[in-house]
Amino acid sequence: MTLKIGKTNQIPAFLAMQVMQDAQRLEATGQDIMHLEVGQPSTPPPDAVNSALSTALGRTASHGYSVALGHPALRQRISAHYQDWYGITPDWNRIAITPGSSLGFAISFLAAFDAGDHIAIATPGYPAYRNLMAALGLVPDLIPARADQAWMPDLEALASSGPLPDGILLASPANPTGVVIADDDLAEICGWCCGMVCG
């Protein structure tokens, strides 16, 4: 019997993880390595966080599965955080807890798009987004972002490059540029999208 290998096996590896693996191999030989490949924290969590985690581990009622979207109390607290910090209160029923942003992106892409859909993303940009899109059968369309435009996506280039994409992925702050999209710029991008789609 031969094991079938899926086509997603041909998706290029996320190079940062390969660099991290190579760096760990060198560390094991005694070499001093400065890790710049992934955004690992350089300091431990605050004592209060470690204490709360330790207490939570002792509560056996919290062990095991939670509801699919995450513990309601946590989702409600996240909604309250948005009210405290940003003055908006998202419906906590629309908040999902994921074990990292990559799974959150995968779930969002699966919910919003179909295989073959085109998603516009800025370049330079975080390479893992392209890998994830390819794994889900989505097609990343690269939008040039340049220093002389404050690394914002060039919407004119997007509009003139062919058929409009089925979606746009915006990251703020962006990796690797660090750009945070200002409210006015985000409103302009949203208005542009609505103008293209809504007529």
PLM regions with names:
Residues T123, L142-R146:
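Short beta->alpha connector loops at strand-helix junctions that form conserved
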Residues A135-D141:
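A short helix-loop-beta submotif of the ANL/AMP-binding
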